[in-house]
Design a protein with these regions (language model features):
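Conserved N-terminal glycine-rich FAD pyrophosphate-binding loop of Rossmann-like flavoproteins
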Residues: 1-9
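Local beta-strand N-terminus motif with an aromatic residue
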Residues: 5, 27, 196-197, 315
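Mid-domain catalytic core of redox enzymes
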Residues: 177-299, 305-310, 337-338
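A short coil-to-beta-strand element that immediately follows conserved catalytic motifs
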Residues: 29-31, 174-175, 242, 311-323
Length: 376
């Protein structure tokens, strides 16, 4: 069972391109639906399958449960964002950016969007990054706002196919082989005793920081200082957790593959997914809790109560998966580590400096840029 129930959107152009490149058909592996932020009571937004940005305008105009004043406040504020080309003071939080929006708009649109895109609550999430995500989703490619929900697990969505693609072309994949250090040898690098032209660090932030801290003493003075500073910047990142509570109920089925939930301190899940509509067994639901530091037992009990209160379902807990360092905290003015460390040494990952938060698309674009950087 995956953790986090990954959501892709149509604006993930590089992810979709790379999937096709390695032989994965997005039409078969992803369920495509219009942008939907509907609650169990039927209120919320649902974009029609219209051209960009008419889909967003229509979704706002027809939002269920919203007063005319709610819709008007969002249109006024969003027009201002567009007028300013979706740019703002980098020190602003999403909550500060949206302070003129009405409470319902914040609760039923901004907060769910923010926590799903940045995995950071609006009170401490970067407004600048949030606006970049909105710009690409709502005003980028046609269909950029459409939800793409995986029908297969994450390994089959890309990594397994990518490994097969590489092997078919003569690439070597060495599993279970931990790298202790990366040694500089003039214009080359040594990894596990093997001399190579270049190294791309495609690891977690903590592992990359450890590796470069151990490698710095053997590098040339200028490179050593860069590696130490990079490791320091990376180790200073803070992280947010993601938890997924899997629960089952006989005959349990949602009106849509994904529903938004009203979240608070005692009802922590922000989204629920109907796994039966995404290739899973009947009756299995997945509740996703982003940016929470509660223990698994507490989360599980709270989510089961939330299911009774908001969905009217009495469910049996199957498994609770918690990843404490799932994504970096995407806060205002955050300093992220650079991609280029030294000639022939490049880092990539969703945490590396870039315009996006910790998303699949951010990671894929970072990897693509790293490969392109080797040829510069």
């Amino acid at each position: 069972l995956d953790n986090g129930q990954h959501i892709l959107i149509g604006a993930y152009t590089e992810t979709l391109r790379l999937m096709r490149c390695v032989g994965v058909d997005p039409e078969k592996t992803l369920l495509k639906t219009p942008m939907t932020l509907l609650f169990p009571d039927g209120n919320g937004l649902r974009f029609p399958a219209w051209p960009t940005p008419l889909d967003a305008l229509a979704g706002i105009a027809t939002a269920r449960g919203w007063a005319l004043a709610d819709k008007g406040s969002l249109l006024r504020v969003a027009t201002g964002w567009q007028w300013r080309r979706f740019q703002c003071d980098p020190t602003l939080s999403v909550a500060q950016l949206c302070q003129n929006l009405r409470p319902r708009v914040m609760a039923e649109l901004i907060e769910p969007l923010c926590v799903s895109a940045l995995n950071t609550p609006a009170q401490r999430a970067s407004a600048a990054v949030f606006l970049r995500v909105l710009k690409d989703a709502l005003f980028g490619v046609q269909g950029g706002s459409r939800l793409l929900l995986p029908r297969v697990d994450l390994s089959e969505l890309f990594p397994a196919a990518a490994a097969r693609w590489l092997a078919e072309r003569g690439g070597q994949i060495r599993l279970g082989s931990r790298v202790a250090s990366v040694l500089q040898q003039g214009a080359r690098w040594q990894v596990q005793g093997e001399s190579v032209d270049a190294v791309i660090l495609a690891t977690s932030a903590s592992e990359a920081s450890r590796l470069l801290s151990q490698s710095a003493p053997t590098a040339a003075d200028a490179t050593a200082a860069t590696l130490r500073q990079w490791a320091h910047t990376t180790s200073a990142l803070t992280f947010e957790a993601i938890a997924t509570v899997y629960a089952w109920g006989a005959g349990a089925r949602l009106a849509h593959p994904m529903l938004t939930l009203r979240s608070n301190a005692t009802q922590p899940a922000q989204f629920v997914f109907d796994r039966s509509q995404l290739g899973g067994p009947p009756g299995l639901l997945a509740f996703v809790v982003s940016a929470s530091n509660a223990d698994p037992q507490t989360l599980q009990a709270q989510v089961l109560q939330q299911a009774r209160a908001q969905l009217g379902l009495t469910l049996q807990a199957i498994q609770t998966v918690v990843e404490k360092r799932a994504t970096f905290a995407c806060t205002p003015g955050l300093r992220r580590p650079a991609q280029h460390l030294a000639p022939g040494l490049i880092a990539c990952g969703d945490y590396v400096d870039g315009p996006y938060p910790a998303t699949l698309e951010g990671a894929v674009r970072s990897g693509t840029a790293a490969v392109q950087g080797l040829s510069l």
